[in-house]
A protein has these predicted regions:
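Acidic, Ser/Pro/Thr-rich low-complexity regulatory regions
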Residues: 1-164
């Protein structure tokens, strides 16, 4: 009989890429919720609990779990977008920090030329546009990307910096 865990692969992938980027965004609380609610504990929850503070092992376990079955990457994108929206509006991260973190996150997701979802590719290139704005090559005012990032299904890089 195959074991069924209530742990969602979308959540696992989200936490995997966040940990790979150096952000925990509530990982411990997320895992503790499963530790408290599952009875008996599923194998994946047990494996994650045994990782302790070993981030590399945790990432490896999450990666293996995510690769077992397909999952909805758009759900992950929405979680990532919500994280950056909150970080931006609560001033936990500046535009520069957000764009460089988005870049690192996109690198952790895959090949920038082969992103299935436009958000990952847009995050990859956004850091370049931030650098152009910092260097004065494009107007910094045009780099106020927050509303576009938070409200759209995908980020359309070229529309961010074109004024009409």
């Amino acid at each position: 009989m195959k074991e069924v865990s209530s742990l969602k692969r979308e959540d696992a992938f989200y936490h995997k890429i966040m940990l790979m980027t150096g952000l925990d965004d509530g990982y411990d609380e997320w895992l503790n919720c499963y530790l408290e609610s599952e009875n008996p504990l599923s194998n994946i929850v047990l494996e994650l609990a045994c990782c302790g503070s070993d981030i590399n092992k945790t990432i490896s376990v999450l990666h293996s779990f995510c690769m077992e079955q397909p999952f909805d990457e758009a759900i992950v994108c929405n979680k990532v977008r919500a994280f950056f929206k909150d970080a931006y509006y609560t001033n936990r991260m500046s535009k520069e920090e957000i764009s460089s973190t988005m870049y690192r996150l996109a690198l952790n997701v895959g090949d920038p030329g082969d992103f299935d979802i436009h958000l990952w590719g847009s995050m990859y290139y956004l850091n370049d546009y931030c650098s152009l704005a910092k260097d004065g090559i494009i107007p910094w005012e045009n780099f106020d990307f927050a509303e576009e990032v938070w409200e759209q299904e995908t980020i359309h890089i070229f529309s961010l910096f074109c004024t009409e």
